[in-house]
């Protein structure tokens, strides 16, 4: 299936020619970019290195995706592309890029983090329209991990508010996954007919049960699994699926409805790719994330594919839930301002829960 990125002319400049990138289902991963025709035959572009800055739980997937893209890009264009990657809490990664970490591509836990980089002048407006599904190649949801046998009888969202339950959850100030945890908890009330007041009281009760707030999703998992802290862990569904596939641990987990369908966008960092001359390869890499081979890798590593073809290929792999989106909660801009702005809901809940 071929498509023409609608905003590509904006990224390359008003006078630049539009370039169609085609995806095929199996035989080839990327059709040869038209830009390659401008280079004299037999003279591929010099080798380039791309830096991906992403959130903590994507590493296993990208360890497989990098060589897939590099091999196909080499075959199609003759150019050698290598990768470096930085993994960490999405909020911390966002600040690092704004502060000067020279990412060519970011794949972050939420659109609001990408918007912060845009507001800093590093990403051009309109990035959401660059690729399908608001430039979001994968989804996930929030899982509730319990101890074997579920001794605390955690069978619904409401059970997290029991006073004898000790919860491990990452810090929403540093972790994108933690903000999704918070959104899932809030929406479990409001998307089920409850009021903001009821949601506030519920979340306060939950976070009173949180003893420590690790900086990111991976550290939260280590706290629960390796250090045996807590009765319950709130984390990505991705973490459970990946860990089981790799045989690292088999902690039981539950998925409750309604739940939030998390959306993790990817895009190029315009100022950096233009300065470094890596735009062509960086944009192709982001588009590659939406191809069937990349979607299959994401699914194998616990991410819910975002594309129709990816979803069809992964049918039966993921539990069906009643989902709501951050859009149902007002969108990230409004939700962040209300909940994570200075003096917002989270600051008040944190102060009262300590």
Question: Model-predicted segments: where are they?
Answer:
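Ligand-binding pocket segment of bilobal, Venus flytrap-like solute-binding proteins
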Residues: 192-257, 265
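Sec-exported extracytoplasmic/periplasmic mature domains
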Residues: 67-75, 98-102, 111, 118-122, ...
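Short helix-loop capping/hinge motifs at secondary-structure junctions, enriched
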Residues: 149-155, 174, 187-195, 272-280
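Extracytoplasmic/secreted proteins, especially bacterial periplasmic and envelope-associated proteins
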Residues: 57-64, 68, 92, 96, ...
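Short, low-complexity disordered leader/linker segments with a strong preference
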Residues: 1-47
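N-terminal segment of the mature folded domain
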Residues: 39-174, 315
């Amino acid at each position: 299936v071929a498509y023409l990125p609608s905003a590509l002319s904006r990224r390359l400049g008003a006078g630049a020619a539009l370039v169609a990138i085609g995806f095929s289902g199996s035989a080839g991963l990327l059709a040869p970019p038209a830009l390659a025709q401008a280079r004299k035959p037999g003279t591929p572009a010099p080798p380039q290195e791309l830096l991906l800055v992403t959130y903590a739980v994507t590493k296993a997937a990208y360890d497989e995706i990098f060589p897939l893209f590099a091999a196909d890009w080499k075959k199609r264009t003759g150019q050698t592309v290598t990768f470096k990657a930085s993994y960490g809490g999405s909020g911390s990664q966002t600040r690092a890029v704004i502060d000067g970490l020279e990412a060519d591509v970011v794949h972050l836990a939420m659109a609001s983090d990408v918007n912060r980089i845009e507001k800093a002048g590093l990403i051009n407006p309109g990035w959401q329209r660059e690729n399908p599904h608001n430039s979001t190649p994968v989804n996930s949801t929030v899982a509730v991990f319990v101890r074997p046998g579920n001794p605390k009888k955690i069978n619904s969202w409401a059970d997290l508010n029991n006073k004898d339950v000790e919860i491990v959850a990452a810090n929403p100030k540093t972790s994108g996954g933690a903000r999704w945890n918070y959104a899932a908890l809030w929406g479990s009330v409001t998307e089920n007919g409850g009021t903001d007041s009821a949601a506030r009281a519920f979340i306060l009760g939950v976070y009173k049960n949180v003893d420590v707030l690790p900086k990111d999703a991976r550290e939260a998992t280590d706290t629960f699994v390796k250090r045996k802290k807590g009765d319950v862990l709130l984390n990505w569904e991705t973490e459970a699926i990946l860990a089981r596939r790799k045989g690292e641990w088999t902690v039981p987990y539950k998925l409750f409805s309604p739940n939030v369908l998390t959306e993790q966008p990817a895009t190029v960092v315009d100022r950096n790719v233009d300065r470094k001359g890596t735009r062509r390869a960086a944009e192709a890499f982001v588009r590659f994330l939406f191809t069937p081979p990349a979607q299959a890798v994401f699914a194998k590593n616990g991410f819910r594919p975002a594309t129709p073809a990816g979803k069809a290929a992964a049918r039966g792999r993921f539990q069906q839930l009643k989902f709501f989106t951050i859009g149902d909660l007002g969108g990230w801009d409004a939700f962040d301002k209300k909940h994570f702005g200075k003096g917002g809901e989270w600051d008040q809940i944190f102060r009262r829960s300590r």
